[in-house]
Amino acid sequence: ESKRLGLRSCLCYEVSDRDGEEKCLQAIQENADFITECQKNQDPMLAAMFGGHALFTISDKTFDRMVAANNGRTGYHIHVSEGMNDVYDSLQNYGRRPVQRLQDHGILGPKTILGHCIHVNTAEMDIIKETGTMVVNNPESNMGNAIGICPVLQLHKRGILLGMGTDAYTHDMLESLKVFLIIQRHNAAMPNVGWCEAMTMLFENNAKMASKYFDRKLGVLEAGAAADVIVMDYKPFTPLSEENIDGHMLFGMMGKNCRTTIINGRVLYKDREFVGIDEDKINAWTMAESKKLWSTLNDRAY
């Protein structure tokens, strides 16, 4: 679907022990097969990672199986120290903190993304830095789950490649940008921090992370880079210049201001209308599939 719609996608399937060994093995195989398929097809718009849920739902045996199935072909995507239960489980059952445990299994590396990392200590931060592993902060999700705040300022000072995500809590990255800034300032009790980190994470580091998986330079307007452009319908009420554009993006613009979207040179959304996409058909399919899923999970009809 992502290919048909013209989206650039790096995907994986979440491995977990929660549903028993059979489902776990199927999830591992799904990742392995998808990685093989991506390597075979060499589609410049589609890439694969190896997905894992979180350390408290993945045993050492399962980690070993994941690493064997991956065979060094790609990086991993996993939630780490999102809540203290992840830390407690790791220490109680394995005698290691989460990041140490990932290092023991060879999960870390320059193409691996650790989501959240709220409760990592300084020793774990050093390991993340030494291995070149990436971290993605999801401020709204963390606040919604009331699990804490990622130590972004400390991670940033260590030179860790730190990106901004949503954990599917929202689809508006500019909304996340605003929330990130105010929660980091609130947490630090300092009204002058987080500005540079916010802009760097969203507009520079996210592109750097994606570039590790796609053989194109992303996130810049220059010859040879991917032609990814959005046009914003934004009317400023104060002077707008290259000196204060960051402030306008933080405090003025919203996702709904997007008027046109171009991905890899293809116009997908023009003047607030999708191009070559039957929105009603997709919405109907999504509703039907969600009803099937909810019915299966909740044992009732919708």
Pin down the residues of each PLM region.
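Divalent metal-coordination and catalytic microenvironments
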Residues: S2, F50, H79, L114, ...
